[in-house]
Amino acid sequence: IKQFTLSQNFDEFHCAGDFQYEGGNSWGCPDEILFKYVEKYIAEEKDERTFHIILTTSNHPPYNIDVVAKGFPKEEIKQKLPDSLGSDEETLNEMGHIWYADQSMGNFIEKVEADKPDTLFVITGDHAERFDFSKEVDLKTLSVVPCIFYGKNVDKDLLADNKVGCHLQIISTLAEMVGQKGDTYSSIWPSLFDYNGIVFNHRLWTDTEKILSLIHI
């Protein structure tokens, strides 16, 4: 990742090996530790305009964080789960790590937003379809990855509710959101503002009306 990141003209690359922390796993450090180091960096560069890509890993196996100690209300959640979902320890632990990842990111956003109110956040995931307890759902719910643009000047009606896109459109969309009149940029795909056609991955395609499989057996 480091070699690729620096080849894309980023000025710096930091990984778990640069931080001091306890716990974590082969994927990296716990999310809350990662975010604290990013907070520190942003605070030190408060007068600079900086662009950060942050890769979190705590909602990834082996799920070895003590999420109950972090505040995950396991017993309360267990009582509220529908019959269609399992309530075994493995499932609850997996849910707890999703909760932990969400809490860590939410706390980070609140802190940075308070210190730098003009910050624009983009939140997305690299894939879906990996959570064992969420298979009894429709294809869209199971497969679609959300992408959230959040900031004080981001209008909730900026994009249509049924808008679809792909990760390759994030940078071009950001360029149009933060750029000045007359700015130009190069991109493989147009922004989410300019394209309303079909998007696809290795097994699915979708438009604003439907999602279908590319594989017919």
Regions found by a protein language model. Give the residues of each.
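Solvent-exposed soluble domains appended to multi-pass membrane proteins
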Residues: I1-L214
